Regions:
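Protein kinase glycine-rich loop
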Residues: 12-19, 24
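AlphaC helix of the eukaryotic protein kinase fold
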Residues: 40-64
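Activation-segment/catalytic-loop signature of the eukaryotic protein kinase fold
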Residues: 76
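Conserved short submotifs of the Hanks-type protein kinase catalytic core
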Residues: 80-94, 98
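Activation segment signature within eukaryotic-like protein kinase domains
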Residues: 113-114
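Protein kinase catalytic-loop region centered on the HRD/HxD motif
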Residues: 117-129
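Conserved catalytic-loop aspartate of Hanks-type protein kinases
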Residues: 190
Length: 194
């Protein structure tokens, strides 16, 4: 990969993965000398004002949340036509991949993971933020066995209408009934997905 620096600060190292809205890279923060993850909005969405607003909203929403079970967001920016979010770099595997590799979890582990996700959602809900896409792929299991909720990409502040467009966003197997009907969402929508 060609060396690229975003915002005059974040040196992209290698691609970690690609999702529905963005590609994630491991990067080096050249100011604070630490490894970070940088989510770069996919080019096909960069010209779409709604997606750009949603991307910025994710950064703002997640940056205001403080929990040991939520991935930390450090920065947001635009470099030319590239929108990016800088966040905590996590080592581990997403819950879905972990279950595929190692099989079903024992009930004690399920309870621990459920409790930690609930704690993360409680923090988000106290800030009136609804995740809207709780699913195993958005739960990172760390080497110590704890989890972090990731990808607030379609999260929305409960009182925000900035990106409300009556589109159904979320993953079919996990969305709440009210989400499929395009109705107003609340904390119970995330709990249903959990």
């Amino acid at each position: 990969m060609e060396q690229r620096v975003l915002g005059g600060r974040y040196l992209l190292k290698d691609k970690v993965g690609t999702g529905g809205m963005a590609t994630v890279y491991r990067a080096q923060d050249q100011v604070l000398d630490r490894t970070v993850a940088v989510r770069i909005m996919l080019p096909q969405y960069a010209g779409d004002a709604t997606f750009a607003a949603r991307f910025k909203q994710e950064a703002q929403a997640a940056a205001g949340l403080s929990s040991p079970y939520i991935v930390g967001v450090y920065d947001w920016g635009k470099d030319g036509d590239t929108y990016y979010i800088v966040m905590e770099y996590l080592r581990g595997t997403d819950l879905k991949s972990g279950i595929k590799s190692h099989g079903a979890l024992d009930p004690k582990k399920v309870a621990q993971i459920g409790s930690q996700i609930s704690s993360a959602l409680s923090v988000a809900h106290k800030h009136e933020i609804i995740h809207r896409d709780i699913k195993p792929q958005n739960i990172m299991v760390l080497p110590d066995g704890n989890i972090k909720v990731m990808d607030f990409g379609i999260a929305r502040a409960k009182n925000s209408h900035l990106t409300q467009d009556n589109n159904v966003l979320g993953t079919a197997h996990y969305v709440s009934p009210e989400q499929t009907r395009g109705q107003d969402l609340g904390p119970t929508s995330d709990i249903y997905s959990l």
